[in-house]
Amino acid sequence: MLPELGTFLLVLALLVALVQAVVPLAGAQRGRSSWMAVARPAALVQLALIAAAFAVLTHAFLVQDFSVRYVAENSNSLLPVMYRYSAVWGAHEGSLLLWTLVLALWTGAVAIWSRQLPAHVIARVLGVMAVVSIGFLAFLLFTSNPFARLFPVPLEGGDLNPLLQDPGLIIHPPMLYCGYVGFAVPFAFAIAALLEGRMDARWLRWTRPWTNIAWSMLTVGIALGSWWAYYELGWGGWWFWDPVENASFMPWLVGTALLHSQAVTEKRGSFASWTLLLAIAAFALSLLGTFLVRSGVLTSVHSFAADPARGLFILVFLLAVVGGSLLLYALRAPRLSLGDDPRRAFAGSSRETLLLLNNLLLTCACAMVLLGTLYPLLADALGLGKLSVGPPYFGTLFVVLMAPLVALLPFGPLTRWQREQASRPLALLAPWAALALAAGVLAWFAAPQGHWKAALGVAGAAWVLLGTVRFLWTRRAAKGRKFTAEMLGMVLAHLGVAVFLSGALLVEALSLQREVALAPGQQVQIGRYALHFDTVEELRGPNYVSDRANLQVFKDDAPVGVLHAEKRRYASGGQTLTEAAIRPGPFGDLYVALGEPLGNQAWAVRVHLKPFVRWIWLGALLMALGGLVTAADRRFRRSPEIQDG
């Protein structure tokens, strides 16, 4: 009876969400405080119901209840217990339930930590979030019920996709969803402000830490996905411009613009329309990512099985939410009351102008990724044939758009609000620009064949790093040791950009790769490393059989270790999977992947040397840490002193 209980809990959650959406919004419109007061307890009850339903599904996986169709399709008696947990969200129905749970968690958190906001504001915010919950709960119950029964009950289940049987995939989807769904908070605030007809900059102070936390979680989620693809797929790459990778990257780009736009609106009263539109766009792109993953319209290693009914449901929901939000924005934004604030005017040479350029470049980059992702689909629909858009398009245009952004980045913190003499930040940064340029020239000559990406990566990273150092020096000279958490968070995030930039471009410029046939006793040379192919042995895991190659590693003729690369064959389904062997290091990885057997005891072996690849993920973690440090600023924890009404 537990599966039926799970369905019943979701039905109750849908009913509570309907109450949470209708009653508080109507109360805010009519000024009924008792109706508005329903929002908080309804949000917490909805969270409890969805969490209980999620616990029921988790229990079904742990006890291997194959009478539940979703469990029977994605688990079996050989699946290790650790992966039974990740199997809960390993396919369509469970991942959608996880999304709904994460949305309920964000809604509950807003209900608990928003006591300082006026009742009519929080009623509208929680009401809007409930509308989104209604859509996902209805989607679950009518097209994707994870508790649907299967009769007759099979004696054995299917299997979780072997690609997902990995510790990284236990963390990656929940973290990614926390980022995706977290943008529902600024989205709900934007819709609430449009419904209200005015936006107090002090309200915006309340939303900024929520946006920073969501953006940080999305950053970590994307980085975890990149790390997983690097070591699990056996290609040695860290980003493939896969459609679903792009689907998570687009809200990150718009979310980055939103972070900066919110700061301007809160501090200076400018960019209000930008901030509202970016808040809508960030969440709309998160919903678009959901559509791409679950509709089957795009091919991806991340996609779930195609289902036209599900795809149509999500598309209608997406159009309703996004179309309704943009219509409301078009009708209300031009008349939005912001009050009189002399700080809103700014000159062409000012920090506001630089941040406006930041917004434009990031949104253009997002539009470029969106076009490249959807163009093959549109071309096919219009009868133009099957087309593909690959890394050459994304890589070239992205560098063109990101280069000016990196060039402008150090100027922002050193430029004054409202009006600035252009010569001042130029004079402050000129010596540092010369040093960065010199570093790039040195990298050009040091790299094999003078690779331009090595020069660009070193020069760009040095420019951002030295510009950040110059800002800290200037700030300390002017203010002593006074640094707010918001400022330290900005510094960490900008340093993360420098580290990421150097890692991403250097690994592309300096990587080495060899594909060879090796038999026991043979060796291959790559860079300063020699790998001696010793033996291949057969091993048995809990639900797979593995051919494991043992390779002795020598660096400059000195032994430094042994690598074990595997080829696994899973018992259920017979799928074969490559498990790469990696010798990590702060300045580069030695990466070995075992290919197919070639006969006469020989195997195809791919060997990569990946300089500075780990700097990519270190940079992403620094950016995420910067967002969390900013969210912890004491200023955001003080009451915004907003008067009700």
What are these regions (language model features)?
Residues M1-L9, G31-A37, H59-E93, N145-P173, ...:
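Membrane-interface interhelical loops and short amphipathic "cap" helices
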Residues M1-S33, I50-A52, F66, P243-P251, ...:
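Contiguous transmembrane helix-bundle modules in multi-pass membrane proteins
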Residues V11-A28, R32, S95-S226:
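A conserved hydrophobic secondary-structure block that centers on an alpha-helix together
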Residues Q29-I50, I112-S133, L195-S216, F240-W241, ...:
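Membrane-interfacial loop-to-helix junctions in multi-pass inner-membrane proteins
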Residues V45-F61, M129-L141, L278-S286, N358-L370, ...:
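Hydrophobic alpha-helical membrane-insertion segments
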Residues I50-E73, S77-L79, S86-A111, F139-R149, ...:
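Transmembrane-helix bundle segments that line or gate the permeation/cavity pathway
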Residues P174, V181-I191, W203-S261, W274, ...:
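Extended, hydrophobic alpha-helical segments in both membrane/secreted and soluble proteins
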Residues V516-R606:
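Soluble non-transmembrane domains of integral membrane proteins
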